[in-house]
Amino acid sequence: MSSAPEPFTHAIASRDGLFFANRYRFALVAEGQFFGLTLRGDELYCFEAGDQPWVPSRLGRIVRFRRSGDCVGERDILVEGLDNGCHQIDFFAGSCFVVDTYNQLILEYDSDWQLAATHQPVPPVRLGETGHDYFHINSFLGLGDSIFLLLHNGRLERPSEILEVDCAFRERRRIPLLERACHDVVRLEEGGFLVCNSLHGSLIDAHGTVVEIDALMTRGLSVGKDEIAVGSSLFGARPVRSLIPGFVTFLDRAYRKTARLHLPAAPTQIRRLDGVDLSLSCPAE
């Protein structure tokens, strides 16, 4: 009798579907173009773009999937009419926060999925503006009385920054990083940060390179108690990004590579299915 396959450990959002995966296999569980991904128990919440991210058609939405084993049920639509270019979403302090990247806003939704507040941690911009005030915020992490936002800064041709704000989104400090165009922000147990140095295929902290992953673009970072998962893919022109495949590289907490999985789509976000994940603002115990 053959043994049952190992259960999936991670959920992976991508431009071409939502996947479940572990170190050995993956499965497509939902069609769609997904960017942000978070979870509560067996419920997964995603930002889904209904059009190309740079198109101002406002077909973005927040959807929920209920997980049952290796599958999910039909999507529940919770919020509609969002900009297609939104990125990460996460629960923190009783609300769900959405990073409205192209408009440089943080949207806060209450438990009834009503818009409770629109926050401006940096000066807002109009869709499509790329001037000296466009930072391309792409990641959100709430901890204690602070919120950490990742400023990509790619078009500014200057290093990315971790922007720390209070819960009223007033700036406390900026932490400069090694390179521009970074993604994801995780705070480790000892207080240091871990970030995807996307253009150099590595993970970095506030001081330098922690580990080289590959020669691709790193994006999507999950940090569990014993295992790290990092997404990577080629960097393509906008019209073809949904066609580009990708990888998930698994490492132990000493940053030694333990496995590598080839996916048919480029990861945009990775979360542990058990919720014990430092990439979440409210990780499970």
Spans of model-derived segments:
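Repeated scaffold domains used in trafficking and secretory/extracellular systems
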Residues: E31-D42, D83-F91, H132-S139, R180-V186, ...
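Surface-exposed loop and turn segments in beta-propeller and other repeat-based domains
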Residues: V72-L82, Q114-F135, R174-L178, L261-L278
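Conserved beta-strand positions in repeat-built beta-propeller and related beta-rich domains
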Residues: M1-A4, H10-R15, C46-S57, V98-N103, ...
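Blade-level signature of beta-propeller repeat domains, shared across WD40, Kelch, NHL, RCC1
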Residues: L243-E285
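Blade-loop segments of beta-propeller domains
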Residues: A27-D90
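Beta-propeller blade signature
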Residues: L59-S68, S160-A168, L243-A254
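Loop/turn-rich, solvent-exposed surfaces of beta-rich toroidal or solenoidal domains
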Residues: E179-L188, G192-V248
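Short coil/turn segments that connect the beta-strands within blades of beta-propeller domains
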Residues: E6-T9, G41-D42, A93-S95, G144-S146, ...
